[in-house]
Amino acid sequence: MRNYNNFNRVWKAPRRPFEKERLDREMKLCGQYGLRCKREIWRVNMTLSKMRRTARLLLTLPENHPRRLLEGSAIMRRCHGYGFLDEDKDKLDYVLSLTVPDILERRLQTVVFKHGLAKSVHHSRVLIQQRHIAVAKQIVTIPSFIVRVSSEHHIAFADASPFGNGRPGRVKRVKRNAAKKGSGGGDDDE
């Protein structure tokens, strides 16, 4: 017998599907961050709403309440670790001020583009999906991967990638072989 997982939904569609201001805002974000569809924005929205809901709940508790101390420090550690908040912003009030672009800035696709490994955000998405990008020697093929601050400096081309130290791509190999045959074949005929 097989164990079935009941996965919860990770995104929530907007209540009003044709709200012009929201549609324009989402389209601008899709273009700016190279997103595939608006569902990626909705997924970030849901993550953000869960974090904000927890922060609001914790802010209603007294400051020395054990639950507020434990869960509040966990949320702040997570926000600092992923780079959503700066290290000097260490209060739960700052979690309420987080926005969707704050989280979209930490996606692997955006970070690869910001580091100059790709010509555009769309190019960085292609590089990631084609297994050219590695985070700390581990190839990552998910453009929506949230990059930690500690692993941000370890983003580079994969060792097996033609952009890195791997063997050259098909076109370069064909040209190299043609050049070898052209120079080597001419000597044999004479």
Curated annotation (Swiss-Prot):
Basic residues bias locations: 169-179
SUPFAM superfamilies assigned to the protein according to its UniProt record, in alphabetical order: Alpha-L RNA-binding motif (SSF55174)
Gene3D superfamilies: RNA-binding S4 domain
Single GO BP term: ribosomal small subunit biogenesis
SMART domains per the UniProt record, alphabetical: Ribosomal_S4, S4
Transmembrane segments: none
PROSITE patterns in the cross-refs: RIBOSOMAL_S4, S4
A GO cellular component annotation in the UniProt record: cytoplasm
InterPro entries: Ribosomal_uS4 (IPR022801), Ribosomal_uS4_CS (IPR018079), Ribosomal_uS4_euk/arc (IPR005710), Ribosomal_uS4_N (IPR001912), S4_RNA-bd (IPR002942), S4_RNA-bd_sf (IPR036986)
Pfam families: Ribosomal_S4, S4
Signal peptide: none
Domain S4 RNA-binding as annotated: residue spans: 106-178
MF GO annotations: RNA binding; rRNA binding; structural constituent of ribosome
Keywords: Ribonucleoprotein, Ribosomal protein, RNA-binding, rRNA-binding
UniProt-annotated stretches for the region Disordered: 166-190
Family statement: Belongs to the universal ribosomal protein uS4 family.
PANTHER family attached to this UniProt entry: 30S 40S RIBOSOMAL PROTEIN, 40S RIBOSOMAL PROTEIN S9
The protein, known as: Small ribosomal subunit protein uS4
Species annotation: Trypanosoma brucei brucei
